[in-house]
Structure formats: C-alpha cells, structure tokens
C-alpha cells in the first residue's frame, strides 16, 4: 500500500522466514493501490486461494506457513474492494490492514508507507498485546526496509533508528530495479528469486527477512538474520516450501 508498485517483497519474505522454521501467518489481499497484491501474486504462482484460506490452520501446522485471504476473513469489507481499486491510492484500509491479522500474531514486522505514520502505529501497538514488533519505513516512500536508500526503524519503547543497506553489507539499488508489474510478472520474478537469482529483489528480501527473524526471536541481529535467510534461499528451502504449499 505504499504506491511504489514494487515487486512483492513481503510475500517473498514470508516464504523465506517460514523456510527458516519460523511459523508465518501471511495476511494479504488483492491489489487495491498497486498492480499485484499478495493474493494476486500467490494465485499466479499456482496457490489456490480459497483452499489455502480454508486450510490455513492445518497449513500453518503442517508446513509452517499459511495465507489468510483478507476477503475471506473480513467479509464485511469485501464490497469496498472495487471502490478501493477505483480510487487507486492509499486509503485508511492500507493503514489498518497490518494490525488486523486474523491469526492474532504477537510478533510482527510491520511496513509503514510513510515515516511520519510511525508514531501513530507505535501508539496503536502499545495498546495491543504484542510480544515484539518492529515498525519500518523506507524513505522512497516504501513500506519495507529499503535497499534503495535509508529507512527508519522503530521498536516500541526504544528511540527510532536510521538504517541503510550498507549497514548490513548489502548493495544500494535504484528504485526501478524493484519495479513490479502484473501478477504474472511478479510471480515470475519471485520464482526466479527462489531459484537463485541475485540482485535488488534478493537483497530487499534478505534485509527484511533478516529483520523479521530478529522480531521472531530467531536471530540475534539483522546481520545474523540475513545470513540465515540467504542460506534458506541458497539451499532451495524456500522454493521447496512454495512447491509443497501449492500442492497442499
């Protein structure tokens, strides 16, 4: 919901983190302010959205990952989908969506579309029953940790930090290197990533997966998390997980 029309970074991050044996409940929807949302891209990869959502609990138990299709879990909002699509830009639903995961998660990496929204999210998080949350916003703006420039990272109870890809040994990339397309385009890029393709997409996924592994208590710091995420990609664990998920 940041309007950057980038590749599906958080969807790829979910697969990589789950391949690191951290259970992930991915909550997403079809595109409203972009060309391809998480649901669109996963469907283009071959995931049956209705079945995946209906079997979410079993999938999370058996595979360590599930997809919670927002249209199925928040049916009262379904009639608004065409209106949001017609508006074509961020609405209040882009802001509240990350806080409405039906799985009731207690640890979460939350991407925020604009840095000035971070304090508002922090107030909301403080009122909810989370164990650990990291709020991140790229300067582009981008609702992820950015590999195209600096990002702001806010953990409740701690001062905000400024982070850059170079801080973690990653290359800085141009925003157009992460530009996405329609669901088929984004799905193809994600599959190539899982098959070992390097570049901006991989670096963006590694950085955000590294942060997610810290939030999960699975990595000591982001650098350690990046190393673990890279291993999950290089050993084909994330690709194998996607294949199992599609066949489940």
Give the ranges of each region predicted by the language model:
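Glycine-rich anion-binding loops and their surrounding alpha/beta cores
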Residues: 6, 43-50, 58-248
């Amino acid at each position: 919901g940041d309007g950057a029309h980038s590749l599906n970074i958080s969807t790829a991050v979910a697969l990589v983190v789950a391949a690191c044996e951290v259970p992930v409940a991915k909550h997403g929807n079809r595109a409203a302010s972009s060309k391809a949302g998480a649901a669109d891209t996963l469907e283009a990869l071959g995931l049956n959205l209705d079945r995946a959502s209906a079997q979410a609990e079993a999938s999370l138990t058996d595979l360590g990952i599930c997809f919670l299709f927002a249209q199925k879990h928040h049916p009262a909002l379904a009639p608004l989908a065409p209106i949001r699509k017609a508006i074509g830009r961020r609405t209040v639903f882009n802001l509240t969506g990350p806080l409405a995961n039906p799985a009731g998660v207690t640890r979460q990496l939350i991407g925020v579309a604009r840095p000035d929204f971070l304090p508002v999210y922090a107030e909301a998080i403080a009122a909810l029953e989370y164990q650990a949350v990291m709020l991140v916003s790229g300067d582009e703006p981008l609702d992820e940790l950015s590999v195209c420039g600096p990002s702001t990272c806010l953990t409740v109870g701690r001062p905000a930090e400024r982070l850059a890809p170079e801080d973690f040994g990653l290359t800085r990339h141009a925003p157009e290197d992460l530009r996405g397309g329609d669901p088929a385009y984004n799905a193809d890029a994600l599959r190539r990533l899982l098959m070992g393709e390097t570049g901006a997409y991989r670096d963006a996924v590694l950085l955000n997966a590294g942060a997610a592994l810290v939030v999960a208590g699975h990595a000591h710091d982001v650098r350690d998390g990046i190393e673990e995420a890279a291993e999950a990609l290089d050993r084909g664990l994330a690709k194998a997980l996607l294949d199992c998920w599609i066949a489940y």
